Regions:
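Conserved oxyanion/phosphate-binding beta-strand-loop segments in alpha/beta enzyme cores
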Residues: 1-36, 66-75, 98-106, 210, ...
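NTP-handling and nucleic-acid-processing catalytic cores
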Residues: 2-12, 135-362, 465-468, 472-483, ...
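Residue patterns forming the tRNA-binding/recognition surfaces of aminoacyl-tRNA synthetases
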Residues: 10, 14-18, 91-247, 335-451, ...
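Alpha-helical recognition segments enriched in aromatics with Gly/Pro capping
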Residues: 308-314, 318-331, 360, 473-616
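Helix-rich, typically C-terminal accessory recognition domains appended to large enzymatic cores
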Residues: 144-156, 332, 413-442, 594-759, ...
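N-terminal catalytic cores of NTP/NDP-binding nucleotidyl/phosphoryl-transfer enzymes
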Residues: 24-96, 100, 124-138, 244-245, ...
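Conserved phosphate/anionic-ligand binding catalytic regions in large, soluble enzymes, centered on
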Residues: 240-262, 422, 428-430, 434, ...
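Glycine- and acidic
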Residues: 38-47, 119-124, 328-336, 383-387, ...
Length: 804
């Protein structure tokens, strides 16, 4: 058994002293490989045992690629703006930067003791002004080009946190962090127009190697639908538009539903006879989250606008108008047409409110439930109760009805998206300051480049008051008066997702103070070749980074549209009781530093890679750590202490060695680390059975194993007689000819019972196999005093002897 603490400390010092993993980004002589981990938020609790799983995966691949002759970039940094540091500042009155820097040091120490091959000279932190200088610069370009803008809109407001939250930060009507109530309220918000990028984001999904489930989540989140926007008149004056993908059902409209919090309802209020009821319902609606309002199993609540009716433009029929919380003011037109015979939600709403139903597509009874488009499209179903369009197929009617409405001048074909504006402001302190000044004349002024970065000011009070941002407390800082321009700075800060939307670019050239990164370097190193991180970021960070990268591509700053060529999601490592580790459940957290101290970092890395497929969630087991350490000791004894290593090859391990090199190489490429380890275990078992182990074979196994267990890999490499690091040694190769089986195992049966087996050369004739079978001592004993009646040879498998 080796001393893991001594060995690991020794090699970590060696790597640091020799800058072993420092990447010369200007070396274009080798093919490049850019491996990236989703960088962590440096929380106060430090790393837990779940963190190293994904980090080890990229580490293994990047180490292999380095040995294969690639110039590897494998950086690490910190997503260091965020709410926990802000809450610390509010509670203690201390600037969150000190708290954050302390946490970064803790995280860095933990990562370094795990032996990852990160180039620490390229470390970044999103809260570093040298970094957020360029976050502000990119935002400035987005603002100047009209993609970032101020919009009056309903938002998720958390009074307890004193800030606006994005949809992905709200779970079941409560804030993701802290579980505080979230309500909807109208506010002027700084937003980024995501929908402007929708088509290219959808197209780009076809060009990247990502999990299909993640791509589908993004498609659904974007929510592209093609349909018709139709204008409806209101009896007594006024009009509104609806968007529908089912224009063929327009003759089946029996009511309309408006968003309770939309402007139209307020405009109609003087004509509404049941105003008190309507106002109460509106008040009830704004207390609900968007998710609660749009959940499919809900949507039956609402109120009829007494005194208000709409006119169906195709037949002049007057229909009732309702408000319902499932209609959102900021989605589509904020109004929907309701066809209860052909939409299940409308059907249930009609039942609840005693509204008529009109069937307009034949083919199914609609007395119990709606006959919906997924059931009638492409089935040859025809229209009924639809005037001149009766008898047409659904597909024919779509075209004909659309043409009629367009010719009437009240409709247009259009594309709609579920995609909303990305709210790009938070009423928090610990985030990037927005480089905008609000002038007295109501216009906005964007800071010139020479005034970037706009640095966060120190505050005496880090808590916002009365719904205002904490930066409102910076009375001197917020007053702007330079070069004849006077105004008040924007006091909201950018969301936590701002820095992570482009950080992968900064790693390439992290100390450039003239531009976010050198264009030549960006062209060479992008896109990221392998990106590993959790699936929970599918419609957040992974969407935002694609938007920013597409925008920077349009600007000619990056040379590729998509930032991440291949994406892999690691599964969660759960506590021994199956509970997720993390800051929400601290008592279930396994501290990797404790494992490193007891077993060694190599053991932790090996165990986590051997637990099962990378993408699956797996429960932690201390017994698994014991087993992993015992196997590492077994390998060490074989190669260093057994005395079996020789410069002469007897050929007995040729096949298993070449099979191992082939399988481990392929498995590392596909991130199938558990099966790669299994194959190395097979080799080690065979090597223990052998009299000697050919030294180049031992060295090849050590090279491959060193990607998973780098410290003991380096140590064994040195003890095998090498002076330089293993990190840049050439990757092992295999001989295809030696992968083929050159012998077969043949079983011998006498009267149907197995009596022995033997090894024979591949291609042996039946006569040769029969001869070898007869020479077995156990077979000869069974045949004593008997006459052989028949010998049946199943070539390559069995020699069956019948005797009596």
């Amino acid at each position: 058994m080796y001393d893991h603490l001594e060995v690991e400390k020794k090699w970590q010092k060696y790597w640091a002293d020799h800058e072993t993993f420092k990447t010369d980004v200007w070396d274009f002589s080798k093919p490049k490989f850019y491996a990236l981990d989703m960088f962590p938020y440096p929380s106060g609790v430090g790393l837990h045992a779940g963190h190293p799983e994904g980090y080890t995966a990229t580490d293994i691949v990047s180490r292999m690629k380095r040995m294969q002759g690639y110039n590897v970039l494998h950086p690490m940094g910190y997503d260091s703006f965020g709410l926990p540091a802000e809450q610390y500042a509010v509670q203690t009155g201390n600037n969150p930067n000190g708290f954050t820097q302390t946490n970064i040091k803790t995280f860095t120490k933990q990562l370094q003791e795990l032996g990852f091959d990160y180039d620490w000279s390229k470390m970044i932190a999103t809260s570093d002004p040298e970094f957020y200088h360029w976050t502000q610069w990119i935002f400035k370009q987005l603002y100047k080009d009209g993609y970032a803008k101020y919009v009056d809109m309903p938002v998720n407001w958390c009074e307890e946190l004193g800030t606006v939250l994005s949809n992905d930060e709200v779970i079941d009507g409560k804030s993701e962090r802290g579980g505080y109530p979230v309500i909807r309220k109208n506010m002027k918000q700084l937003c980024i127009d995501q929908a402007a990028f929708a088509e290219r984001l959808l197209e780009g999904l076809n060009e990247i190697d990502w999990p299909e489930s993640t791509k589908e989540m993004q498609r659904n989140w974007i929510g592209r639908s093609t349909g018709v926007e139709v204008q409806f008149e209101i009896v007594g004056g006024g009009k509104f538009s609806i968007f529908t993908t089912c224009i063929e059902t327009i003759y089946g409209i029996t009511f309309m539903v408006l968003a309770p919090d939309g402007d139209l309802v307020q405009e109609l209020m003087p004509r509404i006879k049941n105003q008190e009821e309507i106002k109460a319902y509106i008040q009830e609606t704004v207390s609900k989250s968007e998710m609660d309002r749009t959940e499919l199993n809900k949507g039956k609540t609402g109120c009829r606008l007494e005194g208000i009716k709409a006119i169906n433009p195709v037949n002049g029929r007057e229909v009732e108008v309702f408000i319902g919380d499932f209609v959102l003011a900021n989605y589509g037109t904020g109004a929907v047409m309701a066809v209860p015979s052909h939409d299940q939600r409308d059907f249930e709403y009609a039942i609840a409110h005693n509204i008529d139903r009109i069937q307009v597509i034949e083919g199914q009874d609609v007395s119990e439930h709606a006959f919906e488009k997924q059931d009638y499209l492409g089935k040859g179903c025809k229209l009924i109760n639809s005037e001149e369009f009766t008898g047409l197929t659904v597909e024919e009617a779509k075209v004909a009805i659309t043409k009629k409405l367009v010719d009437m001048g009240i409709a247009k074909e259009t594309v709609n998206y579920r995609f909303r504006e990305w709210i790009f402001a938070r009423q928090r302190y610990w985030g990037e300051p927005v480089p905008i000044v609000h002038l007295e004349d109501g216009t906005d002024y964007v800071l010139p480049d020479e005034e970037l970065p706009l640095i966060l000011p120190e505050l005496e009070d880090y808590k916002g008051h009365n719904g205002k941002a904490p930066l409102e407390n910076a009375t001197e800082w917020k007053q702007y008066n330079q070069n004849g321009v006077k105004g008040v700075r924007e006091t909201s800060t950018m969301p936590g997702s701002a820095g992570s939307s482009w950080y992968y670019l900064r790693y390439i050239d992290p100390h450039n103070d003239k531009q976010l990164a050198d264009p030549e370097l960006l062209k060479h190193w992008m896109p990221v070749d392998l990106y590993v991180g959790g699936p929970e970021h599918a419609v957040g960070h992974l969407m935002y980074s694609r938007i920013w990268n597409n925008y920077l591509y349009d600007k000619g700053i990056v040379a590729c549209k998509e930032p991440f060529k291949k994406l892999v999601h690691q599964g969660m490592i759960l506590g021994e009781n199956g509970i997720k580790m993390g800051k929400r459940f601290p008592k279930y957290v396994v501290n990797p530093s404790d494992i490193v101290k007891k077993y060694g970092a190599d053991t932790l890395r090996l165990y986590e890679m051997f637990m099962g497929p990378l993408e699956q969630s797996k429960p932690w087991s201390m017994a698994g750590c014991d087993g992993a350490r015992r196997w590492i000791d077994r390998v060490y004894r074989l190669f260093i202490e057994s005395g079996k290593i020789t410069d002469t090859n007897d050929g007995k391990l040729d096949k298993v060695y070449n099979q191992t090199v082939k399988k481990v190489t392929e498995d590392y490429e596909s991130l199938g680390f558990n099966t790669a380890i299994s194959q190395m275990m097979i080799f080690v078992n065979e090597a223990y059975k052998a009299d000697t182990v050919y030294k180049p074979y031992a060295e090849g196994i050590v090279k491959m194993l060193s990607c998973i267990t780098p410290h003991i890999g380096e140590e064994m490499w040195q003890l095998l007689g090498h002076e330089s690091t293993i990190a840049y040694e050439p990757w092992p190769t295999y001989d295809e000819a030696k992968l083929v089986e050159d012998t077969i195992t043949c079983v011998v049966q006498v009267n149907g019972k197995v009596r022995g087996k033997f090894e024979a050369a591949v291609g042996s004739s039946n006569e040769e196999l029969q001869k070898q079978a007869m020479e077995l001592e156990t077979v000869q004993r069974q045949l004593e005093g008997k006459t052989i009646r028949k010998v049946i040879v199943v070539k390559g498998k069995v020699v069956n002897i019948v005797a009596n």
